[in-house]
Amino acid sequence: MTSTIRQHAATRTGFSSVTRTGRTVLTVPARLCFIVEERYENDVMPGAVVDVLRSWGHEVDVLRPNGTVADLWDLLFTGSTRYDAFVLKTVSEGPGLTLLDAAGAAGITTVNDYRSIRLARDKAVAAVRARAAGIPFPKTWFASRTALLDQIPADMYPLVIKPNNGSSLKDVYRVDNPEELAQLDIDDSTRMLAQPYLVNPGYDMKLYNTGDEVFATIKRSPLHPGADVVEEQIPVTPELRALALAVGRAFALDIYGIDVVETPDGYVVLDVNDFPSFGMVPQAAERLARTVLRVTRRNAIAAATTTTVDSTLVPVLEATA
């Protein structure tokens, strides 16, 4: 195993549950690998989840893809540590996503499902997935180069412009006319999205699903930086809960967040995040740790009772009221 993974092999005390077919169901305690890129090393998430899992007696290693060459055969097939699941916290197109895809291709559980993460992270694909599922989502244009955005008709302004692979609300702009669009200083090689600006109260709502419950918060909007906004947790109405669960089903995500705005025509989803910060969510680390273990156990049992690989993307959301 690579040197950047914190190993605990010398103190392994777990055992494996084995079915009558001889296939391993799940090691107890669970053996997990978190893939965490440099940007998130000092963030609360996912470090707090790692700490909780370790405090419960599970064995958790942390792989930093920016600091090592990963021996894929050792990591996924022949190494002394056989992981029950991999958990990803990376930037949109970081190298960690390739490692998670590799784990999924090897038949190992990933949280979230590696195919679901791809659906959510490509914002153009996410927009289409949401629209196809009947989820309210803004009309979306995709441009392979920034310069192509000037082909959007002038009567569609104002527009919201953002990178197709953006994260953390960076480089999100409102432009009221083609002249303002031309003034944006954006690398022309950047793949961009454009969506009509939707009238809203001046703040965003963030819905979080920890896998067992939905939470709602009010967050500042990058389009209204001067607005007087109190960021706080708010009650989850039945409508908001239904919207959050619909997104989970459409993308087959277990843990996720969505950005929502309230418009004159109702709530509209703006973005889907496969592993957000879960800010202001009570006991977030404990809730997420339980979901990681539940998904790992569920998938291990399912794998032990089937003889074929099911490549169909299916909903895995288990949120309850």
How would you name each of these model-derived features?
Residues 159, 193, 215-216, 256, ...:
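Protein kinase-like catalytic core scaffold
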Residues 38-139:
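Conserved N-proximal alpha/beta basic substrate-recognition cap immediately N-terminal to
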Residues 91-93, 165-166, 275:
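Short glycine-rich anion-binding loops that position phosphate/pyrophosphate groups of nucleotides
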Residues 1-26:
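Short N-terminal or domain-adjacent regulatory/targeting segments
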Residues 170-251:
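Phosphate-binding site of ATP-dependent enzymes
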Residues 28-33:
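Extreme N-terminal starter segment of soluble prokaryotic enzymes
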Residues 138-157:
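Rossmann-like NAD(P)H-binding beta-loop-alpha module
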